[in-house]
Amino acid sequence: TGLPELNGFLPLAKLMWIRENEPEIYRQTEKFLLLEDYLLYRLTGQFAAEKTLASSTGWFSLRTDGYWQEGLAAAGIPQEKLPELFEPGTVLPAKLLPDVREKLGFRADTLVVTGAMDQTAGALGAGNLRPGCVTETTGTALCIGAALEKADLDDPNRVTVYRHVKPGLFLMLPFCMTAGLFLKWFKDTFCEAECRQAEQEHRSVYELLDELAEQTPPGAGGLLALPYLTGSIQPCSNPNARGVFFGIGLDTKKQHFLRAVYESVAFMLRENLELLMRVNHMPVTQIRSLGGGAKSAVWRQIKADVTGIPVGLAAQSESTSLGAAMLAAVACGGKASLEQAAQAADRAVVWTKPDGAGRYEQAYQKYCELFRTLNPLF
């Protein structure tokens, strides 16, 4: 499947639970649909799913590029209860239902096109269609996407791999649950004064935090943070891991804690990039930054300095929506190919280059050693 494990979060496990605990509901259900599948059904009356999203369910096989027959059989789920699979960016055979068309005000010749899972659509919107280019999304979580032409599904590191928007292309996706959420927690817990100031000045509080972090020298006064407030996933999985501030002294101020939060996410990014390069035996030459964290120039600079790799900011901040639009444009004939559509994303990138090589090397090594030392204690 490309997934590191089969657990209770997966739709496959949830279907098994419904079958075993709500047998009457299971028996009466003709099709089980994900939310996106349901929207396609309501629009057209057709049961349809697309492959990138299906690859996140536990019932899709990356080896066969279709339903995982052995897994469905072992789970006792007949394929007939699932929708037909389509490529992302496919014009569905079924047309818009007349009542839907009337309610939404669409023309009779409006086409319905399958989209893609958020991370794969975002990678497309950022131009991430070739090996060596990586997207990182610092939202609530940190998601790192690397396009691959070949995926080692037996790799012992068990990094998540999804189907990409193109046949024969995969998206390896290391995932860390608290990145922007770490900063939000810090803001909510310790930055009441900054929140009041931002409200009075009609500014985003995150702009104020960026300014405070930028005024604080690299290294955060020797303070290190581990950003694992809800557990770690990659490169070392430990659901019991928790956040840590290490190295507090009498001269440690609020701005040092804040800077350590920014730097810890950059360290986490570098650690997972090194995992990607180790697993795939290929260099990473550029990082394209997405999500709310991409708006922070100081955070992009810290990431570039920590990793030693240029970090790019797309002119179009909503890369996921742009990727979905690219799929529709190719499907409707507006663009000849996804590669052609993605060229626009290539041109519209502002780059932040590494400055001060080696500035963070000692701190990064201490960060890695700190987690290795504390991991057995969580």
Place the predicted regions along the sequence by residue:
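A polyampholytic, Gly/Pro-enriched intrinsically disordered region
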Residues: 1-9, 103-107, 132-135, 330-344
